[in-house]
């Protein structure tokens, strides 16, 4: 498996895997399939300029996972935040999430970060296992899930 950092000219590749992710796991993201299917080239390019995206692929033609790293507004300068981690269902449990998170961590470290954070929806134990295996630990902070106030998210952190 290889992990690649996407550049602005990879906008079609990002669009393809992101829309696939939304088709497969509609509740996994803070966005919707209808919204992102309507994005134009400029929207995808803007995403690639404003954040760091990585994709995982194996020997086949399709990308098998993705992750995005951002500088969260209001966060410490030495903190980066993981969003949009997704792995194709048939590749889950094979180390793809770990490889993506490790690449995100090494890139964040190279950029001067000392900590990587993320939010996990309560009850998603498979995600919790992947985060723990990648060196993350719950911080104790929780929040209400914006798109569904009946659900909560748990904050995780990994020192780099």
Predicted regions and their residues:
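Acetyl-CoA-dependent GNAT
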Residues: 8-90, 98-103, 107, 111, ...
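C-terminal "cap" of GNAT-fold acetyltransferases
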Residues: 114-117, 121-128, 134-160
């Amino acid at each position: 498996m290889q992990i690649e950092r996407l550049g602005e000219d990879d906008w079609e590749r990002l669009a393809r895997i992101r829309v696939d992710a939304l088709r497969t796991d509609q509740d996994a993201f803070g966005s919707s399939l209808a919204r992102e299917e309507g994005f134009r080239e400029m929207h995808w390019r803007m995403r690639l300029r404003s954040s760091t995206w990585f994709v995982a692929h194996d020997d086949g033609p399709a990308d098998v996972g993705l992750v995005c790293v951002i500088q969260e507004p209001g966060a410490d300068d030495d903190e980066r935040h993981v969003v949009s981690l997704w792995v194709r269902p048939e590749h889950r449990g094979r180390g793809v999430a770990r490889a993506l998170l490790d690449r995100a961590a090494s890139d964040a470290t190279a950029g001067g970060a000392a900590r990587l954070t993320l939010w996990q929806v309560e009850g998603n134990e498979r995600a919790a296992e992947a985060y723990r295996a990648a060196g993350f630990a719950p911080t104790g902070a929780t929040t209400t899930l914006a798109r569904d106030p009946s659900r909560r998210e748990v904050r995780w952190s990994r020192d780099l």
